[in-house]
Regions:
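Binuclear metal-dependent phosphoesterase catalytic core
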Residues: 59-63, 84, 135-138, 151-182
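Core catalytic region of metal-dependent phosphoesterases/phosphodiesterases
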Residues: 1-61, 138, 164, 168-173
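Conserved catalytic scaffold of divalent metal-dependent phosphoesterases
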Residues: 37-127
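Active-site environment of divalent metal-dependent phosphoester hydrolases
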Residues: 1, 18-24, 40-46, 74-78, ...
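Short hydrophobic patches on amphipathic alpha-helices
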Residues: 4, 99-101, 136
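Structural motif
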Residues: 13-14, 108-110, 145
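Structural motif corresponding to alpha-helix initiation and N-cap regions
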Residues: 20, 129-130
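Proline-aspartate-enriched helix->loop->beta-strand connector
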Residues: 32, 106, 132-146
Length: 182
């Protein structure tokens, strides 16, 4: 039933805070690549068997140039997958440089947290990253997918254009056409 319902899926994306067992199940059912980043609740050694972590990396998967940055704003003195905006700016700059050296604009940017002011929350835990606003303005990926902020009952905006990038909160899940993301 899962294979038939999602027969056109070419790539699975995990935006953090999803159990590895769940992602592994989806990979085995659909038999397509999985690109993922860790969330702020994931363990330091979070790994998904059959998946590819794109945290701080970029790669081509099924013809799609994918890059990712996991984690959230730092809200504890010591916390796994938590960063200050300055730390994330450094990570984003390295990722942008790596993708440029690879000679390809990023098609799909995956993150856990959203950009600052887009789908984020008013509290420190759910604040977005200004570094992502800069990354989107400079790198101009076609699409950014993020999680972290849990939208209840469709009361909040989950799709926003920022610069040239369509930004989508994928909570709880989304099927997206890369050619016509909505």
């Amino acid at each position: 039933a899962v294979r038939e319902r999602f027969a056109d899926v070419r790539l699975i994306v995990g935006c953090g805070d999803l159990p590895s067992e769940y992602l592994e199940y989806v990979v085995t059912q659909l038999n397509v690549p999985l690109a993922y980043v860790p969330g702020n609740h994931d363990a330091d050694d979070f790994v998904v068997q059959g998946g590819l972590s794109v945290d701080g990396r970029w790669m081509k998967l099924n013809g799609i140039a994918v890059a990712g940055l996991g984690g959230s704003q730092r809200y504890k003195p010591v916390g796994k997958h938590q960063y200050t905006d300055q730390e994330m700016l450094g990570r984003a700059a390295r990722l942008l440089l790596t993708s440029r050296i690879g000679g390809r604009r990023v098609d799909l940017f995956i993150s856990h947290a959203p950009p600052l002011g887009v789908h984020d929350g008013p509290d420190a835990v759910h604040a977005g990253f200004q570094a992502f606003n800069t990354f989107l303005r400079t790198g101009q990926p076609r699409l950014m997918l993020h999680g972290h902020t849990h939208v209840q009952r469709n009361l909040a905006t989950t799709v926003t254009r920022l610069h040239r990038t369509q930004v989508i909160n994928v909570f709880p899940y989304r099927v997206i056409d890369l050619e016509d993301p909505r």
